[in-house]
Curated annotation (Swiss-Prot):
It comes from Escherichia coli O157:H7. It comes from the Bacteria. The gene is mdtF. Belongs to the resistance-nodulation-cell division (RND) (TC 2.A.6) family. Gene3D superfamilies: Multidrug efflux transporter AcrB pore domain, Multidrug efflux transporter AcrB pore domain like, Multidrug efflux transporter AcrB TolC docking domain, DN and DC subdomains, Multidrug efflux transporter AcrB transmembrane domain. This is Multidrug resistance protein MdtF. Part of the tripartite efflux system MdtEF-TolC, which confers resistance to various compounds.
Amino acid sequence: MANYFIDRPVFAWVLAIIMMLAGGLAIMNLPVAQYPQIAPPTITVSATYPGADAQTVEDSVTQVIEQNMNGLDGLMYMSSTSDAAGNASITLTFETGTSPDIAQVQVQNKLQLAMPSLPEAVQQQGISVDKSSSNILMVAAFISDNGSLNQYDIADYVASNIKDPLSRTAGVGSVQLFGSEYAMRIWLDPQKLNKYNLVPSDVISQIKVQNNQISGGQLGGMPQAADQQLNASIIVQTRLQTPEEFGKILLKVQQDGSQVLLRDVARVELGAEDYSTVARYNGKPAAGIAIKLATGANALDTSRAVKEELNRLSAYFPASLKTVYPYDTTPFIEISIQEVFKTLVEAIILVFLVMYLFLQNFRATIIPTIAVPVVILGTFAILSAVGFTINTLTMFGMVLAIGLLVDDAIVVVENVERVIAEDKLPPKEATHKSMGQIQRALVGIAVVLSAVFMPMAFMSGATGEIYRQFSITLISSMLLSVFVAMSLTPALCATILKAAPEGGHKPNALFARFNTLFEKSTQHYTDSTRSLLRCTGRYMVIYLLICAGMAVLFLRTPTSFLPEEDQGVFMTTAQLPSGATMVNTTKVLQQVTDYYLTKEKDNVQSVFTVGGFGFSGQGQNNGLAFISLKPWSERVGEENSVTAIIQRAMIALSSINKAVVFPFNLPAVAELGTASGFDMELLDNGNLGHEKLTQARNELLSLAAQSPNQVTGVRPNGLEDTPMFKVNVNAAKAEAMGVALSDINQTISTAFGSSYVNDFLNQGRVKKVYVQAGTPFRMLPDNINQWYVRNASGTMAPLSAYSSTEWTYGSPRLERYNGIPSMEILGEAAAGKSTGDAMKFMADLVAKLPAGVGYSWTGLSYQEALSSNQAPALYAISLVVVFLALAALYESWSIPFSVMLVVPLGVVGALLATDLRGLSNDVYFQVGLLTTIGLSAKNAILIVEFAVEMMQKEGKTPIEAIIEAARMRLRPILMTSLAFILGVLPLVISHGAGSGAQNAVGTGVMGGMFAATVLAIYFVPVFFVVVEHLFARFKKA
């Protein structure tokens, strides 16, 4: 193959140009993302049961839906929540690779089976089935510059004019409004109702009748008279629009003829539909919209589309309304990808300098350099063909590939240069001879490296998706690299290189010094190798000790899934004691805001707080803050990193009285949770009941708090049981008094909850009408006695006449996991520990809890557990496949052993570098380790291949052959290894956006390659001789 292209250099150029053109077109069309679709697809079912408490919602809605979600293809796990606001949410998580569209259809079909069993009020509200991510992509906040709009004005405008257009934007899965649009609020006065012998149901029924749209038909409608000349629509009644019009609704006419109007028994106003959240931006009134990504959508494209849509809508905003983005995860994605591109360029420059140092010939150096863009662009074309994106993983694969792909070209050029110098041949003839010598080695390297990375493509789950990105990228670049090394590179060598001048090349002073030093080093290396081969037994014992050290390092290196990143944003939760009011929560959130904007003013750009909302549930005692940091370029230094900021905040905010305030970083993969660290579900497997499960949870939290050196920040991601005021209705007594139980229930529900009646028109938009007790009549326990219900004889009877009240406790939010009552526990690993260590520790603590209490991992922790289970199998399969590939290539069982024995030398270097830097055995490390395995084998192949050839063609003994092969291949091995090490150096020293992942990949690979090079050049001859002697004895036996 190589000879064909040596004789046809134009054809080689044509193929290279076609590859580059295809890659250039691919880059222009490939979408950009931080990660591929790693997170498994999720489908969320949401339902509302107005006025119901959490237990009622769970019993009558959540469980009914859950029990019908059986037989769904690819369902991994299911979690659900039921809260005191009447909301039920069931999130179904499917295996990676499942079509979200098909999953959504299947869930909808199953939901239809559950519908007849659900309460009528739930069916009337409607049930949504969304395929959106559970995590927030970005938050758009809206503020009034001059304060002319209050928070309700802002929220109404956002809900009426902005929310719907954003929800229709491409890539948006769902939107969540922090605020509420206006509604017509009817605030009832129980004393006035009692005065006029009225109950809330009378008010509701009259609003329904008098605020109604009636279709009146037509005058002259078809069929019509033959001479009909008139056709017009009949308008009977339209919906009311103003508080004044509602106030005039007629409730009853008394015996004296006087009328009782709605305004006589209630205060009517235009108020908020929902008062459950209070939003602030840097302490000022605001409203906000949280954007959640549609499953499978591209984050960058969606963010751009949202901002473009808001920019379009801003032309119609009220004069003082302004949009800000207090939380946006996409700048991190853009900058981290840019950083990897920058690293790619730096790697190419460093590799060029290394090659020039060793080759000392610009013509020779330019040949491998030309191969870099050809192979990289060709790889982009393949990525486009297989449906990949430009993301952190594929770009890391490119950076690793630079060192690999120049290896092939360097081996070709270096050998051609050697043949030209030693055999005094013209470049073309030298290239023909050289390719005959190394063609098999190039194929062997390609086969081995492909064999190393191929098993990664078949792993499952989110980890498997990460492995696949690396696998396809590296294999594609490797195969293209070998193709270029056997087509374009030899063609360039034959046409660009010059014959050696008489007396050889005369290097400049720097190169002369380098060559002198290198020749001395080569001679010293040759002598050392000869000495080593005299006492191979001693060095095999040393090798075994290195293997033992490798095993120890493997056991002591902490495990995790993915490294944490400084994403430029983080969150802070605030939870007050049960029963705390919104007033108290707002004060605490203001303290949080003041801290970040004063104590961390050099690092923090903005703070957006939402009272009444949190990932642990909705409630007046819950709050959440979105903190946006200044750009990375303005936060240089470890003390200004997100980790340091969070650590300082955790200490400072812990002093806030009567509140638990907890700042936390975002997870590495947004769709796999809301916080970094571990995510555990404590399960009531034994059906012990809510109270026993709560006790077990508290015991677990107490045990965890006793070991701050293992775990920290261990907390429940839920709401504590709160005091509840229970009304016990004596049904028999009520019946005896002629009071219907349904009337009692509706009176209580309307007064202390609210009743949605129907809709009205406001500024051209349909909005809702609610009836509820006025504020003074639902604040205290005694207010229950102010309400009356009319009996069958028309007499008003107070609720106190047939009911009693008592205080009790209950949960405002109940959780379930896979159909079992559960409680979510979040936490972080202590300093110096990994999430893997923390997970193992927490699992041991759960084992100490009462029988019947179990656990399961969810979100990111679920994927980490899956990853740790797959890693040993991945290593084993890769090693076996490499061994078999070498055996097939060399038609020998002994040669593969000589090559494979070098693998632990690279592994120990990777482990040592990772351990010394305090990093973890995560997915990136595992990818780097496989790369190290391949590169270690590659160096061994370069030596062994030449030794075998000398034994077969020149009849040399194994010792003579391996010494000569080691001497000949030392220069290309050191050159390619140093090129690779310097190629990944930018990853190792990276800081800022995306540096966590870059450090994790680069450190292990660099350490592994360094050890594989320094140790392998001495140990490979030992392995070769030992294996050859053992197999020779075996054959004689």
